[in-house]
Swiss-Prot record:
InterPro entries: Aminotransferase_I/II_large, AspAT/PAT-like, NHTrfase_class1_PyrdxlP-BS, PyrdxlP-dep_Trfase, PyrdxlP-dep_Trfase_major, PyrdxlP-dep_Trfase_small. The modification N6-(pyridoxal phosphate)lysine is found at residue 247. It comes from Streptomyces avermitilis (strain ATCC 31267 / DSM 46492 / JCM 5070 / NBRC 14893 / NCIMB 12804 / NRRL 8165 / MA-4680). This is Aspartate aminotransferase. It catalyses: L-aspartate + 2-oxoglutarate = oxaloacetate + L-glutamate. The keyword Cytoplasm applies. GO terms for cellular component: cytoplasm. Belongs to the class-I pyridoxal-phosphate-dependent aminotransferase family. Its EC number is 2.6.1.1. Keywords: Aminotransferase, Cytoplasm, Pyridoxal phosphate, Transferase. It comes from the Bacteria. Gene3D superfamilies: Aspartate Aminotransferase, domain 1, Type I PLP-dependent aspartate aminotransferase-like (Major domain). Homodimer.
């Protein structure tokens, strides 16, 4: 429908109508629907730990349900005790010292990202987005009036962008750099030296930086997590940190995230949230309080399992002709290149892109994967290894069998 269409005839606004469905959630929903219909589908689509939330966190929520004070409205920006605990947890885990007044508690990381961009972007402001990227980032930027500018890295650099690439993408309209380490979808982890170089470049150019630290505790081997505002402290006044309990504590369904930033930005984002959703569910906030106040024993156990699965999935994927899978250093995703398989005949079909290849894998092997188009880089597939060991081996074995049939 054209922009000239009378307002009374436009059923959906152009702004919201332009938003794409979350590709990762769509793949996960399709896999679950097929399973419900009786097909033995194995899903590698969802970025979700397969572990239950630790019991001490659940018990805190159960107790909160019975406490009348949590049956009422609470401050829109979050329970004061949770904000203080998040500040303490941030200092403990990353060395970044912040005040509770710099914290906004949100309904998960997605709301945190949108509200952060909404608080600092004006129409036309550009945000440099290293690709491959998580599907939600560009949509949040556009909703906030900004313009995402992709900077693509591939497997030859371990999916890490360089300062030279970032500088080439910078214009007079550039306001923000999005920085994510460990990365979804690639599992890339930047070294301290790389973070320092990128951070100092951003500081010299006067840019804001939004850094997503949701996978801070999921790093493997010799890789280490480093918080950008700790490595480059002069960025603190123009740095926004997004985090949450979902990945570290297996709490994806509880929907608790947060934004840490300069007080004026947090105040603006809190005002926005006061009109959008008000406070996050009090029961979920109390559960998050128990999570961030506790130790990291549970995540250590999960990390050990993820590390084992990481090694298995990389080995098995690299056994497939035409597949190249770098070893991820963080998060829980493998991001193999399958460019060499595109256009080849597989069971009577010739997939021309990874959307078609992913559809073929789902139909023929009954395995759900996410095509690279969802992350801004066609020619790749994302597979989450946050699923049981047996399912992981069975699922990749099915993919091996199917793709071994590829021929010119």
């Amino acid at each position: 429908m054209s922009a000239a269409t009378p307002p009374t005839e436009r059923r959906v606004s152009a702004r919201v109508g332009a938003i794409s469905e979350s590709a990762t959630l769509a793949v996960d929903a399709k896999a679950k629907a097929l399973k419900a219909a009786g097909r033995p589908v194995i899903g590698f689509g969802a970025g979700e730990p397969d572990f239950p939330t630790p019991d001490y966190i659940v018990q805190a929520a159960i107790e909160a349900c019975s406490n009348p004070k949590y049956h009422r409205y609470t401050p829109a920006g979050g329970l004061p005790e949770l904000k203080a605990a998040i500040a303490a947890k941030t200092l403990r885990d990353s060395g970044y010292e912040v005040d509770a007044s710099q914290v906004l508690v949100t309904n998960g990381g997605k709301q945190a990202i949108y509200e952060a961009f909404a608080a600092i972007l004006d129409p036309g402001d550009e945000v440099i987005v290293p690709a491959p990227y998580w599907t939600t980032y560009p949509e949040s930027i556009r909703l906030a009036g900004g313009v995402p500018v992709d900077v693509v890295a591939d497997e030859t650099t371990g999916y890490r962008v360089s300062v030279e690439q970032l500088e080439a993408a910078r214009t007079e309209n550039t306001k923000v750099l999005l920085f994510v380490s460990p990365s979804n979808p690639t599992g890339a982890v930047y070294t301290r030296e790389q973070i320092e170089e990128i951070g100092r470049w951003a500081a010299e150019k006067g840019l804001w930086v939004l850094t997503d630290e949701i996978y801070e505790h999921l790093v493997y081997g010799d890789a280490e997590f480093h918080s950008l505002p700790v490595v480059v402290p002069e960025l603190a006044d123009k740095c926004i940190v997004v985090n949450g309990v979902a990945k570290t504590y297996a709490m994806t369904g509880w929907r608790v995230g947060w934004v840490i930033g300069p007080k004026d930005v947090i105040k603006a984002a809190t005002n926005l949230q006061s009109h959008a959703t008000s406070n996050v569910s009090n029961v979920a906030q109390v559960a998050a309080l128990a999570a961030v106040s506790g130790d990291l024993t549970a995540v250590a156990e999960m990390r050990e399992a993820f590390d084992r699965r990481r090694k298995t999935i990389v080995r098995m994927l690299n056994e497939i002709g035409g597949v190249l899978c770098p070893e991820p250093e963080g998060a829980f995703y493998a991001y193999p290149s399958v460019k060499a398989l595109l256009g080849k005949e597989i069971r009577g079909k010739r997939p021309q892109d990874t959307v078609e290849l992913a559809a073929l894998i789902l139909e023929e092997a009954e395995v759900a994967v996410v095509p690279g188009e969802a992350f801004g880089t066609p020619g790749y597939l994302r597979l989450s290894y946050a699923l049981g060991d047996e399912d992981l081996v069975e699922g990749v074995s099915r993919i091996q069998k199917l793709l071994s049939e590829a021929k010119d």
